[in-house]
């Protein structure tokens, strides 16, 4: 995890979770990306353009970068 933090040192999102992409679903203007980190999953909704630009694919390693002001909590 320390190595991954070094990789993204120049971005403002200090909370970084590195995992494997389990799913990328593009629908219209948005894309859903599911990242597996250990035995947990995190789902992010990003623009379809961003998903295409980053060429996100199932099985790739990716990092979820979170800013404390941009985290949403949902009751489950």
Name these PLM-found stretches.
Residues 1-24, 28-32, 41, 48-76:
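Glycine/charge-rich catalytic "coupling/switch" loops of P-loop NTPases
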């Amino acid at each position: 995890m320390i190595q991954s933090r070094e990789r993204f040192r120049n971005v403002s999102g200090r909370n970084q979770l590195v995992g494997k992409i389990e799913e990328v679903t593009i629908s219209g203007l948005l894309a859903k990306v599911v990242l597996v980190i250990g035995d947990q999953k995190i789902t992010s909704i990003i623009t379809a353009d961003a998903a295409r630009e980053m060429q996100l694919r199932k099985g790739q390693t990716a990092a979820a970068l979170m800013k404390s002001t941009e985290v949403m909590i949902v009751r489950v």
